[in-house]
Amino acid sequence: MMGGECKVHQLQAAGDGGPGAVAPFVAKTFHMVSDPSTNAVVRWGGAGNTFLVLDPAAFSDFLLPSYFKHRNFASFVRQLNTYGFRKVDPDRWEFAHESFLRGQAQLLPRIVRKKKKGGAAPGCRELCEEGEEVRGTIEAVQRLREEQRGMEEELQAMDQRLRAAESRPGQMMAFLAKLADEPGVVLRAMLAKKEELAAAGNNGSDPCKRRRIGADTGRGGVATGGDAAEMAQSRGTVPFPFSVLGQVFY
């Protein structure tokens, strides 16, 4: 990388903003494209009068930070446009400039920023390029913050699902403990729930049927084992999901 930096400095050695000077952005781009070790990412076109970015992701992640201190590919393309480069192929990242040719570094001073109305003050070129790099860095930070925010929201949703899954075994254990301690209460609650469902489905049930249910229960309103089995056989099993004592089980 030291040799590459020397070459970039040599391209800029003609002066700082004076005649024959090469803009820092142009010098860095020329060296980056000419480096054979990065041909898998960016290289010259076959005729040597264009250059192609073959892997925009790797270009943004590795080359841009090395040369321009940011990772924003869109900012790099914007700077190319300000120096008069044009995109020659709509289906790939291939750019050209009449003075940006392979092996023709002496032509680089001809590549200058497009002048705005009113012209530009001397020395503004470097300042504008630094502003582009700062803007690219800010956009990259904003993108990282958005990604972090999305990850935090996803983690919160996963935590809520995990808490809900952890609470279900506790609810079932509480129900089973209640069933062991007071089987009659639970059975009455189950039968009452089924009565409620039947009444909702039939817009009211037969009063005689309700009286028969009360007569079938044993002392204290608790059905005996045989009575409960007979009732379950005649009335069908308790439908699932069902709710007992305010808890819903599936």
Swiss-Prot record:
<keyword id="KW-0597">Phosphoprotein</keyword>
<dbReference type="InterPro" id="IPR036390">
    <property type="entry name" value="WH_DNA-bd_sf"/>
</dbReference>
<dbReference type="GO" id="GO:0006970">
    <property type="term" value="P:response to osmotic stress"/>
</dbReference>
<comment type="similarity">
    <text>Belongs to the HSF family. Class C subfamily.</text>
</comment>
<comment type="subunit">
    <text>Homotrimer.</text>
</comment>
<dbReference type="GO" id="GO:0034605">
    <property type="term" value="P:cellular response to heat"/>
</dbReference>
<keyword id="KW-0804">Transcription</keyword>
<keyword id="KW-0238">DNA-binding</keyword>
<dbReference type="GO" id="GO:0005634">
    <property type="term" value="C:nucleus"/>
</dbReference>
<dbReference type="GO" id="GO:0003700">
    <property type="term" value="F:DNA-binding transcription factor activity"/>
</dbReference>
<dbReference type="InterPro" id="IPR036388">
    <property type="entry name" value="WH-like_DNA-bd_sf"/>
</dbReference>
<dbReference type="GO" id="GO:0009737">
    <property type="term" value="P:response to abscisic acid"/>
</dbReference>
<feature type="region of interest" description="Disordered">
    <location>
        <begin position="199"/>
        <end position="226"/>
    </location>
</feature>
<dbReference type="Pfam" id="PF00447">
    <property type="entry name" value="HSF_DNA-bind"/>
</dbReference>
<keyword id="KW-0539">Nucleus</keyword>
<dbReference type="GO" id="GO:0006357">
    <property type="term" value="P:regulation of transcription by RNA polymerase II"/>
</dbReference>
<protein>
    <recommendedName>
        <fullName>Heat stress transcription factor C-1b</fullName>
    </recommendedName>
</protein>
<feature type="short sequence motif" description="Nuclear localization signal">
    <location>
        <begin position="209"/>
        <end position="212"/>
    </location>
</feature>
<feature type="region of interest" description="Hydrophobic repeat HR-A/B">
    <location>
        <begin position="144"/>
        <end position="180"/>
    </location>
</feature>
<comment type="function">
    <text>Transcriptional regulator that specifically binds DNA of heat shock promoter elements (HSE).</text>
</comment>
<keyword id="KW-0175">Coiled coil</keyword>
<keyword id="KW-0805">Transcription regulation</keyword>
<feature type="coiled-coil region">
    <location>
        <begin position="129"/>
        <end position="182"/>
    </location>
</feature>
<keyword id="KW-0346">Stress response</keyword>
<dbReference type="InterPro" id="IPR000232">
    <property type="entry name" value="HSF_DNA-bd"/>
</dbReference>
<dbReference type="GO" id="GO:0043565">
    <property type="term" value="F:sequence-specific DNA binding"/>
</dbReference>
